[in-house]
């Protein structure tokens, strides 16, 4: 479609050596929905990178695949333990993207409530930064 972005990824993760993170942040996207083939490779590495970059990460379980059901199950369980939200495409279609909890916002709200907001830090050139990527 006109205006759509095309990203060519050189490795398994869609974030590795691409501009995906920059594009998503500029568009204020905070949730990524993962689908595709070879769950243990492309889906899993993209999932871990998305979580590390503080995106709410959803894996549509019936829209990705592995060589065997056992490999698929184990990889999905591992991604869930890392923080991914697992759901099937019917559930996602029924509820839509607006129902995916904004985990980053919830963490920031709890930090403010508990007065545990991290202190800002200074870079070597004197600029002040907050640990929050958003």
Model-derived regions, located:
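Active-site-adjacent betaalpha module
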Residues: 1-109, 119, 123, 129-133
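Major-groove DNA-recognition helix of helix-turn-helix-type DNA-binding domains
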Residues: 113
């Amino acid at each position: 479609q006109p205006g759509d972005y095309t990203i060519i990824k050189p490795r398994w993760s869609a974030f590795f050596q691409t501009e995906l993170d920059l594009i998503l942040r500029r568009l204020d996207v905070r949730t990524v929905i993962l689908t595709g083939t070879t769950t243990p490779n492309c889906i899993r590495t993209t999932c871990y990178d998305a979580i590390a970059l503080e995106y709410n990460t959803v894996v549509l379980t019936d829209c990705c695949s592995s060589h065997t059901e056992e490999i698929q199950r184990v990889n999905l369980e591992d991604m869930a333990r890392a923080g991914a939200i697992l759901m099937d495409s019917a559930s996602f279609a029924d509820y839509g993207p607006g129902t995916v909890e904004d985990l980053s916002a919830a963490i920031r709200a709890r930090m403010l409530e508990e007065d545990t907001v991290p202190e800002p830090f200074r870079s070597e050139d004197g600029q002040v930064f907050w640990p929050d990527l958003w």
